[in-house]
């Protein structure tokens, strides 16, 4: 008799995805972050659901409802800070996941990569609208500044901004619709994750060597389920440490002040995980140019499969491109730092140089390095 997990219509899908899935035997811990992202998404949906039970999306009561959750709801403070810091953990895992994809050449799996970019955009949109909900000073002014960027679109810009706001400024209508978006988007993300996995399992996973691993596959369970469990425990340890000991470490002090349209904070800045893109936006003096650079800073990931002339898969045996990759990572960290600094010399100049370098490494230097490496291989073999 066939084992039930191999014959039952529903269990069969689970079996092919998480149990009997043929997996390369040499994938390292960098491949753990996919499952960690799944855990982060589950934590965010669960904590968000409990927060939504007590939150009110009205400008007069939103700020006090968050205070009420922290003070009066049983373990409300824990749920709120798990949700806020869970978002930070989500983005840390997300950036490492994308970084691993670039390093090991996972962008050659085109469909999986493109759905991944769509997931990144959707997650960023979810985090942005979520940051507005506590209705603190930085929530309000962040929403005003970022949505106002759409006014740079020729002809329809101003109309589009007023349509998103639901009026002539960020107000009650904006907060209500942002809450609606923040509630629905995680479920759209979940659906996209399933499509992401569907495409991944069509081709099979990549591996650190960049070679075809069809001849050396092992079942996902128990080998990688145990490995993923270790990663999950480490993730939860970091998340709980952050939540219980340093809950406000990654937040902004301005957000402890209720939103006031008549008082602008000294430095308006988004959450830390958007700072690199915000620095690129600020480094261009033209408004429309800045908006385009902001979008391109993420959309350029879609160009990786097109800008890869290398004969090798991944960077494991490509020292020149490896060096460029780590310069690129360091550059993103510099941009993140610049995004949190005031708009004054020398920060503006550093931001402009880093922004140019960000695009130049991807569009110019990496393809050239790949061609040089191809020629070196021709000379020696």
Curated annotation (Swiss-Prot):
The keyword Membrane applies. Its cofactor is heme b. Binds 2 heme b groups non-covalently. Heme b b562 binds at residues 83, 182. PROSITE patterns: CYTB_CTER (PS51003), CYTB_NTER (PS51002). It is found in: Mitochondrion inner membrane. InterPro entries: Cyt_b/b6_C, Cyt_b/b6_C_sf, Cyt_b/b6_N, Cytb/b6-like_sf, Cytochrome_b, Cytochrome_b_C_euk/bac, Cytochrome_b_N_euk/bac, Di-haem_cyt_TM. Heme b b566 binds at residues 97, 196. The chain crosses the membrane at residues 33-53, 77-98, 113-133, 178-198, 226-246, 288-308, 320-340, 347-367. CDD domains: cytochrome_b_C, Cytochrome_b_N. Belongs to the cytochrome b family. This is Cytochrome b. It comes from Kunsia tomentosus.
